[in-house]
Amino acid sequence: MSNFDQEFDASGLNCPLPILRAKKALTAMASGQVLHVIATDPGSVKDFDSFAKQTGNALLESTEEGGKYHFLIKKG
């Protein structure tokens, strides 16, 4: 996993909560900073891809490990 500035664990939360919490966290971050999100909802894979495209942020990494999905989102 690459370097990141902030992390939050959305394990156990279902759509749309991981996206809403990521949006809130990114709002408080500076442009160029990276947020690491951990989720367990399989739907979060396509959700975070769409979210990044719609909001002008960059999805740097999307991986699955042991039933947990890890996303690195760079604030645009």
Model-flagged regions — what are they?
Residues 5, 32-36, 68-70:
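Intrinsic-disorder/low-complexity, polar/charged segments enriched in Ser/Thr/Lys/Arg/Asp/Glu/Gln
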Residues 16-58:
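Amphipathic, hydrophobic secondary-structure cores in small proteins
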